[in-house]
Amino acid sequence: MSEPRPILEARGLVKHYGQVVALDGADFELYPNEIVAIIGDNGAGKSTLIKALSGALQADDGEIRLDGERVRFRSPGDARSAGIETVYQDLAVAPSLDIASNIFLGREARFRGPLGLGLRLLDKRRMRREAAAHFAELEIGVQSIKQPVESLSGGQRQGVAVARAAKWARRLAIMDEPTAALGVRETRQVLDLIQRVREGGLPVIIISHDMPHVFELADRILIMRLGKRVAVVTPESHTMSEAVAIMTGATAAELQQAMTKEEPGE
C-alpha cells in the first residue's frame, strides 16, 4: 500500500527578520487523523513556523501544500478559507459576548429574506441551538450556552476557543500552547477535549513547552532547533529526556547518558 499523503506539508521554509534567521529551510508534515506536536527551545522557530502555516506571516522562500496542492496564504483569512483554524495563546475570544456568539464570531447566522437574501438581523436561536449541539458532541460542560464568556473559568474559555476551531476547521486545527496558565483540573479538561477533537476526525498541530502533555497527546513530535527541523520522534521511540537532549543540541555522549538514565531498573 502507498504511504498516505500529508494533509499539510511544508518544504524548505525560510524567514528572515533582518539579519536574524527565524526559519532556515524548515520542513513539516501533518497526516490524516493525527496530532503532531512542535517542540523546541526559545528562538527555535516554532512560532514562526506556525505563523507561516496559519497565514499570519509569509515565508521568504519554500512552499506549503494543502492536500497536495501548493498554496500561498497571504493572511489568516486565507488559511481559514482553506479550512485551517488556529487557537492562539491569547485565545482571541470576545469576553462580553455569550458562548454561542463566540462560536459564530465572524460567521454569524442571519435570517434569510423572502428572496433568499441575507438580512442584517442575527438568528440567535439557530446559533445557540447549533452551539449547544456542538458542545454536547465535544462533551464540554457549561451551565448555559447563553453565558457571557467573561463569566467562565480559564479552562472553559479555552474550551470555547477549541470548540470554535473544531466547528469551522475543515482540514486541520492549530493550537498554540493550549494549556498555558491553566490549573491542573482545567488542563486535564483541555487535554481530553483535544483528544476528542482528533477522534472526531480533525488532525491537530500543537505547540507546547509541557513535555508530559506533548508525550501524552502527540502521535509524532517535531523537534526544532535554530530554525530547522532536526528530528521527528514518537512517544514510543524516544523518552522525554532524549527529546530534550535533541532539542538542546546535546552531543552523542550526552544523548546516550539521557537514554541510560531512563532505562528500566536504573
Describe each model-derived feature in a short phrase.
Residues 2-266:
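Glycine-rich phosphate-binding loops of nucleotide-dependent enzymes
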